């Protein structure tokens, strides 16, 4: 049989966060390639560990839907950029590590500006995080953890506390598009012209849209008032007066219709002119209010304070759904060499995120598979050390317990004959009683019997260790009484050796 080899056929670096390699594994017997390829693929995608950011606390940010003054990206975009960072570590750590960032604009914040923990570094230092304008600052700290697969965090308690705080504070919207929740303010007995509470990030375009919508609502209200007053006037004067006047002047129906149409057109023109003048006045009044409040608002926004009390809201830790998997994609294909039709090989394609080399990923996957299947390997029972008990050495050699005596009283009688060298006799008694009970119900498949002996015992309907001890005792009694038995001496010897190694029978 040829040696099974792992050879790299092709490898390339597509970019800093994408490594590709194609390996050939084999040769294998027909049918083994599918088992190996599928096992490697599933292990590579699920069992390899990685490093990622799991928790972020940004200075002055209470939730991920807010914005920061002087920062182009919203907090949600910053969280997504940090989630996409590819981190790696030379060592394995179980305790979360702390990193931080202190950056003052103008400039673009990249991964190389992060102050990462020891032995943790970023694969792509030029990966962007945020863009800051002049006099803008971005300060935050984060946790770096190591894990497998991915985690989805649902901090229900934190969000519930945040919502209660918002409802109790009754905060309105800021007017600037570059503010955080710290710059929100109260406007008592006034309606906000920009937005509704719990909204942020309203830009200049949205401000204009909101103002236009507000003016349209005001115009609709004026239209309703004019229509109501006009109907009341017609009701008070009466329509019969107009019709009688036309009838007395001998005006026909066609002239009356023409007069109504002209009157309607004249009314529409007059109303539109009035509405236009009122809309212009309202718009100028609103813009004057915005211009007058701009300096005061700008000072408040720069200071990061609210108008209600001047106190800054506390920052909240924002969880991140982290993806720890260093493997992006795995494909495998079974290849049969025409020169050797009875042999096959596996072609394995691996794409990584740059935090691990594809060849190292194959080695780690093989280790994980070995670790996964190692508990199912054949185990060899080590001779027990039941003689090293708190009892005296002389008594422990001569003492033998009968496993088919299951009553507690008999176990106490047997143990009472032993000279204890320990003061805690009750604990030793309970431990020995539990051990005897566990051994009694143990299946004989846990003993190292040969296939022939195991088959013989099963045919004799011997399934547990207690039944095996009873069978061995009966065979020993028959041998003393010179009764011929159909059990071979080799089988009895194997049973005796296994029971001695298991600690059920004395070794001498």
From Swiss-Prot:
This chain is encoded by the gene named rpoA
Q: Which residues form a coiled coil?
A: none
Q: What does this protein do?
A: DNA-dependent RNA polymerase catalyzes the transcription of DNA into RNA using the four ribonucleoside triphosphates as substrates.
Hey, which family's this protein in?
A: Belongs to the RNA polymerase alpha chain family.
Quaternary state and partners of this protein? Answer: In plastids the minimal PEP RNA polymerase catalytic core is composed of four subunits: alpha, beta, beta', and beta''. When a (nuclear-encoded) sigma factor is associated with the core the holoenzyme is formed, which can initiate transcription.
Biological process (GO) annotations held by this record are: DNA-templated transcription
Which of UniProt's keywords are assigned here? Chloroplast, DNA-directed RNA polymerase, Nucleotidyltransferase, Plastid, Transcription, Transferase
What organism, scientifically named, is this protein from? Oltmannsiellopsis viridis
Catalysed reactions listed for this entry: RNA(n) + a ribonucleoside 5'-triphosphate = RNA(n+1) + diphosphate
Protein's recorded name:
DNA-directed RNA polymerase subunit alpha
Annotated region described as Alpha N-terminal domain (alpha-NTD), given as residue ranges: 1-380
Domain comment? The N-terminal domain is essential for RNAP assembly and basal transcription, whereas the C-terminal domain is involved in interaction with transcriptional regulators and with upstream promoter elements.
Give yes or no: UniProt keyword Transferase: yes
Enumerate the subcellular locations listed in this protein's record, separating them with semicolons: Plastid, Chloroplast
What's in the GO CC field? Answer: chloroplast; DNA-directed RNA polymerase complex; mitochondrion
**Main localization category:** plastid
Region annotated Alpha C-terminal domain (alpha-CTD), chain positions: 434-508
Q: Which GO terms describe its molecular function?
A: DNA binding; DNA-directed RNA polymerase activity; protein dimerization activity
The EC code for this enzyme is 2.7.7.6
SUPFAM superfamilies per the record?
Answer: C-terminal domain of RNA polymerase alpha subunit, Insert subdomain of RNA polymerase alpha subunit, RBP11-like subunits of RNA polymerase
């Amino acid at each position: 049989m040829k040696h099974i080899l792992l050879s790299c056929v092709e490898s390339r670096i597509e970019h800093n966060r994408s490594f590709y390699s194609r390996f050939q594994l084999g040769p294998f017997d027909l049918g083994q390639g599918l088992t190996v390829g599928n096992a490697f693929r599933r292990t590579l995608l699920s069992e390899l560990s990685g490093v990622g950011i799991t928790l972020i606390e940004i200075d002055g940010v209470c939730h991920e839907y807010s914005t920061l003054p002087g920062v182009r990206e919203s907090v949600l975009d910053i969280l997504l950029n940090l989630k996409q960072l590819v981190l790696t570590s030379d060592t394995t750590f179980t305790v979360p590590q702390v990193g931080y960032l202190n950056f003052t604009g103008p400039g673009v914040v990249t991964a190389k500006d992060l102050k990462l923990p020891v032995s943790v570094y970023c694969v792509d230092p030029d990966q962007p995080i945020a863009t800051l304008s002049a006099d803008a600052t971005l300060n935050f700290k984060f946790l770096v953890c190591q894990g497998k697969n991915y985690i989805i965090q649902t901090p229900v308690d934190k969000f519930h506390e945040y919502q209660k705080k918002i409802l109790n504070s009754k905060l309105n919207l800021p007017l600037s598009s570059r503010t955080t929740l710290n710059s929100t303010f109260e406007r008592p007995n006034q309606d906000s012209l920009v937005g509704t509470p719990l909204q942020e990030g309203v830009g200049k375009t949205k401000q204009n849209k909101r103002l236009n919508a507000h003016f349209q609502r005001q115009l609709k209200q004026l239209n309703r008032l004019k229509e109501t007053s006009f109907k009341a006037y017609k009701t008070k004067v009466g329509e019969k007066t107009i019709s009688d006047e036309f009838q007395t002047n001998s005006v026909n129906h066609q002239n009356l219709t023409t007069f109504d149409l002209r009157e309607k057109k004249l009314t529409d023109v007059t109303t539109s002119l009035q509405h236009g003048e009122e809309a212009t006045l309202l718009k100028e009044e609103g813009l004057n209010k915005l211009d007058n409040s701009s300096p005061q608002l700008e000072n408040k926004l720069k200071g990061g304070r609210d108008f209600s009390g001047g106190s800054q809201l506390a920052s909240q830790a924002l969880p991140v759904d982290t993806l720890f998997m260093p493997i992006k994609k795995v494909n495998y294909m079974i290849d049969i060499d025409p020169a050797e039709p009875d042999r096959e090989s596996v072609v394995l394609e691996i794409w990584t995120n740059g935090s691990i080399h594809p060849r190292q990923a194959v080695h780690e996957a093989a280790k994980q598979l070995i670790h996964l299947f190692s508990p199912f390997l054949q185990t060899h029972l080590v001779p027990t050390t039941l003689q090293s008990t708190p009892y005296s050495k002389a008594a422990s050699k001569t003492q033998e317990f009968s496993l088919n005596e299951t009553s507690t009283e008999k176990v106490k009688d047997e143990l009472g004959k032993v000279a204890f060298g320990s003061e805690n006799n009750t604990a030793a008694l309970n431990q020995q009683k539990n051990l005897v009970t566990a051994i009694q119900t143990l299946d004989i498949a846990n003993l190292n019997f040969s296939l022939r002996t195991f088959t013989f015992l099963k045919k004799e309907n011997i399934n547990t260790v207690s039944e095996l001890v009873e069978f061995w005792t009966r065979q020993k009694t028959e041998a003393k009484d010179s009764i011929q038995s159909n059990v071979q001496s080799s089988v009895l010897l194997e049973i005796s050796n296994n029971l001695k190694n298991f600690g059920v029978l004395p070794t001498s």
